[in-house]
Amino acid sequence: GRRYFAMTQPNVRAVCQDGRFFLQKTDRRYDVIAVDAYRPPYIPFHLATVEFFQLARAHLTDEGVIAINVGRTHDDYRLVDALAATLAQVFPSVYIIDEPDPGYGLGNSLVVGTVQTTRLENLRVNSTTLTHPLLVEMMQRVLPQVRIARPSPGTPIFTDDRAPIEQVV
């Protein structure tokens, strides 16, 4: 995983286990929590609820972000929107970064929640200060795809007591 995802920096800690169980057992705080467990139709509902996102937020630093990778079809954003709406119950700013459709009808979106209230314009301004070539290249690709999450009224919000994911995927 480290080599495939280019996670060779010494300060990156990859945890390959149930994220909720791990967070319940640790006191550590992180700058970034990345979750990659949402490939339809096999969604672990306990990693998609308000309560899970509250637990994750408690383990983020004051400047922290949570980033969740969500599989989707090229035109069905129901799961992306539901996860964004659920994330917005816990995080003041939520963004969606859509990966361009690779041409076979499936794609991914990255849903990002920030502990601090942020503005999309701040991301654009801050990206101009980057010097690492990999980060500069990534931001050039990502910035045009970033949008503020604005789920429609009535979009489901998942909780431990009610997470009808199978109705969304």
Where are these regions (language model features)?
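Residue-identity detector for glycine
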Residues: 1, 19, 34, 64, ...
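The AdoMet/dcAdoMet-binding core of the Class I SAM-like
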Residues: 1-67, 74-80
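Short amphipathic alpha-helical surface micro-motifs
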Residues: 28, 36, 90-96, 139-140
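Composition- and surface-driven signal marking solvent-exposed, interaction-prone regions
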Residues: 47-48, 82-83, 124-127
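Soluble small-group transferase modules, centered on the S-adenosyl donor enzyme superfamily
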Residues: 95-169
